[in-house]
């Protein structure tokens, strides 16, 4: 599955196409990045929409254990997970500690999925892990499950398809 930058320039901040359609209640939806980061972040859906975005191809969502078809998911638009992490900056004490970092994505319901530094920054997984705020060209609200974490490089997307992403905790694992 290919992710392509939405705007021609990655530094473009002209996203009026998206912000004009947002719900004022989206300001209440907050995603936090915390833990071993230089700059802890608290982001609203509106803040996510203002960042450079990527889109992914539609996919079939299937149950991981039974392979039962759940539904076809239209293309997501959102921010690369790596871009959010890079924006917060990684904090570590010793050289090489970053290679032992994990990123725990946690939903409002407590469902949590991990990523390693190697997955996100040293493999194709990082090129296809997004925090989505739009699906099928329509903005997602909290009622729709926004923000949604999606890992497009996974063989089966369901286990790391997380609705109502609340926080991303960054940790350095002990040797």
Residue ranges and their predicted role:
Residues 1-175:
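N-terminal intrinsically disordered, low-complexity segments enriched in P/E/S/T
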């Amino acid at each position: 599955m290919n992710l392509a930058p939405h705007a021609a320039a990655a530094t473009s901040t002209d996203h009026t196409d998206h912000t004009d359609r947002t719900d004022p209640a989206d300001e209440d939806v907050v995603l936090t990045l915390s833990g071993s980061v230089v700059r802890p972040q608290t982001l609203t859906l509106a803040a996510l929409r203002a960042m450079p975005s990527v889109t992914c191809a539609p996919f079939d969502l299937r149950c991981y254990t039974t392979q039962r078809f759940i539904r076809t998911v239209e293309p997501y638009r959102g921010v690369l997970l790596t871009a959010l992490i890079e924006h917060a900056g990684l904090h570590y004490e010793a050289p090489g500690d970053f290679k032992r970092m994990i990123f725990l994505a946690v939903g409002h319901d407590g469902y949590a999925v991990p990523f390693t530094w190697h997955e996100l920054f040293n493999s194709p997984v990082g090129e296809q892990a997004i925090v989505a705020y739009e699906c099928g060209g329509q903005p997602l609200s909290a009622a729709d499950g926004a923000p949604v974490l999606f890992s497009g490089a996974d063989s089966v997307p369901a286990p790391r398809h997380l609705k109502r992403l609340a926080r991303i905790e960054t940790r350095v694992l002990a040797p």
